[in-house]
């Protein structure tokens, strides 16, 4: 991610903060957004000792951010977002010039996620479609690679 103490970072879909606990101490400002009050509360607990953290319980697409970010990332969250082009375009608009957007998308193409007592609707997409969304938002794809469970994109704002 190329983090340093001067960078501002946004995580879309911060969840319980499992990635944020490693990222937040490495940057100037860390902001995480998630729609789930339960997971935001867990993230608050997990990130309690880190001062430069802001957690937002809200929808990334409708929340009105008051700052721009040097790095925006999202790990396996976009499968929950139906309006992917809108989400990528919003992320691009929140980046500082030269800022990085890192996105991992799940290789699983199921339409639902079984959560035991309920099923959650998913909006899977292909790597090709995701690359198109990123480019249409005015970002340059620097890297694209696959892991066992995901395709990861690293893009940059001009």
What is each residue range found by the language model?
Residues 86-97:
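A short glycine-rich, Lys/Arg-flanked "PGG" loop and its adjoining helix->strand segment in the class I
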Residues 139, 145-158:
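Core SAM-dependent methyltransferase catalytic element
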Residues 98-105:
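Conserved beta-strand signature within the Rossmann-like core of class I S-adenosyl-L-methionine
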Residues 7-13:
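Conserved class I S-adenosyl-L-methionine
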Residues 16-62:
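Class I SAM-dependent methyltransferase SAM/SAH-binding core
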Residues 61-72:
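A short acidic, Gly/Pro-enriched loop at the edge of an enzyme's catalytic core
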Residues 122-137:
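Short alpha-helix
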Residues 71-83:
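A short SAM/SAH-binding and catalytic strip from SAM-dependent methyltransferases
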């Amino acid at each position: 991610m190329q983090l340093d103490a001067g960078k501002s970072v946004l995580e879309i879909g911060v969840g319980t903060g499992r990635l944020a606990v490693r990222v937040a101490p490495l940057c100037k400002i860390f902001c995480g957004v998630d729609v789930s009050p339960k997971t935001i509360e867990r993230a608050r607990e997990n990130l309690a000792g880190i001062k430069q953290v802001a957690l937002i319980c809200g929808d990334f697409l409708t929340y009105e951010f008051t700052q721009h970010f040097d790095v925006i990332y999202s790990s396996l969250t976009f499968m929950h977002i139906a309006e992917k082009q809108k989400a990528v375009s919003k992320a691009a608009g929140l980046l500082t010039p030269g800022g990085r957007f890192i996105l991992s998308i799940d290789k699983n193409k199921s339409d639902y996620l079984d959560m035991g007592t309920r099923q959650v609707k998913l909006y899977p997409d292909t790597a090709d479609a995701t690359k198109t969304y990123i480019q249409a938002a005015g970002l340059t794809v620097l890297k694209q690679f696959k892991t066992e469970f995901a395709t990861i994109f690293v893009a940059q704002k001009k």
